[in-house]
Amino acid sequence: MNGHEWLSPVLRLRSEMQPLRTDVEASVRSLPEIRAVIFDVYGTLVISGSGDVGSADTRDHSDLIEQSLEAVGIDDLLPKRPTMEMIHSQIESINARRRADDCPKPEVDIVEVWRRVLRQSGLELGAERVGIAVALAAQYEARANPTWPMPGSFEVLTALANAETPMG
């Protein structure tokens, strides 16, 4: 897998969403001394179709796993079917190992999660085949957590870029 092929399912499987209204009133004021803008992604630049980040998703996504395996073309290569329990177990295991005082909630390396789940399911992926795990992660995430740009995010990013404001 070269380039950004993993992005294709993320774009192809999405559909327009609108953000949920809140009771918070906007408070806009001039900040002339801004030297850079740092964004939180979910809920700021991107709408998430699965709800709040970190919310406990207890839905059974077996059908989404099967669709993703089929889309990547490895559904017939696995002696054992991956399960949500396997995915959650790997996420918990990786997070427990990476958790520290200075990082109480480590970011999940979803490609590593899928590599481990596939290994548990009987498919070992060496470094030369990591693209399979990348493709599978993209296929599954596009189905389980669809996203859509937050209204106005393109305009905000464009205005900041045109003003040469550093962003992160």
How should these model regions be labeled?
Residues 1-39:
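Non-catalytic pre-domain segments flanking phosphatase-related domains
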Residues 44-45:
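Hydrophobic "anchor" residues
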Residues 63-77, 108-125:
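Helix-loop "lid/cap" segments that line or gate small-molecule binding pockets
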Residues 35-40, 124-129:
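Short coil-to-beta-strand
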Residues 37, 132-148, 153-168:
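Substrate-recognition element of Asp-dependent hydrolases with the DxDx(T/V) motif
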Residues 50-101:
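Conserved phosphoryl-transfer catalytic core
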Residues 86-94, 113, 131-142:
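Short, Lys/Arg-enriched alpha-helical recognition elements, typified by the DNA-recognition helix
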Residues 104-106:
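Low-complexity intrinsically disordered segments
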